[in-house]
Amino acid sequence: MSATIPARDLRNHTAEVLRRVAAGEEIEVLKDNRPVARIVPLKRRRQWLPAAEVIGELVRLGPDTTNLGEELRETLTQTTDDVRW
């Protein structure tokens, strides 16, 4: 169950409410004692690794008996590592 706060408290204590949400809490905002919004934490974003780093880790793990290394080498030409964000 999520915590509830009046809209006035959200206005007056925004930083504290956002800290609670960042810590994983869901907060429902009330206006005139009725729920009007829910503030929820964002899902964690995937962290992408450069292809060379992934290959290096696979090499460190030992011999490839699945042919995965060869498939990855073929795929390296299709990566976006050189694209600037």
UniProtKB/Swiss-Prot annotation:
Region called Sufficient to interact with and neutralize VapC4, residue ranges: 55-85
Which GO MF terms does the UniProt record name?
A: toxin sequestering activity
Look up keyword Membrane and say if it applies.
no
| Region Not required to interact with or neutralize cognate toxin VapC4: start-end pairs | 1-54
Q: Name one GO biological process term.
A: detoxification
Fetch the InterPro entries from UniProt: Antitoxin_Phd/YefM (IPR006442), phD-YefM_TA_antitoxins (IPR051416), YefM-like_sf (IPR036165)
Does the entry feature the keyword Plastid, yes or no?
Answer: no
Keyword annotations: Toxin-antitoxin system
SUPFAM superfamilies per the record? YefM-like
Write out the similarity annotation: Belongs to the phD/YefM antitoxin family.
Q: Which PANTHER family match?
A: ANTITOXIN VAPB46 (PTHR35377:SF5), ANTITOXIN VAPB49-RELATED-RELATED (PTHR35377)
What is the stated purpose of this protein? Antitoxin component of a type II toxin-antitoxin (TA) system. Antitoxin that counteracts the effect of its cognate VapC4 toxin. Upon expression in situ, in M.smegmatis or E.coli neutralizes the effect of cognate toxin VapC4.
What domain comment accompanies this record? Answer: The C-terminal domain (residues 55-85) is sufficient to interact with and neutralize VapC4; exchanging the N-terminus (residues 1-54) with VapB5 allows neutralization, while exchanging the C-terminal domain (residues 55-85) does not. Many single residue mutations in the C-terminal domain construct but not in full-length protein prevent toxin neutralization, they are not all annotated here.
On subunit structure and binding partners, the annotation says: Interacts with cognate toxin VapC4.
Q: What is this protein called?
A: Antitoxin VapB4
Lineage at the top is: Bacteria, Bacillati, Actinomycetota, Actinomycetes, Mycobacteriales
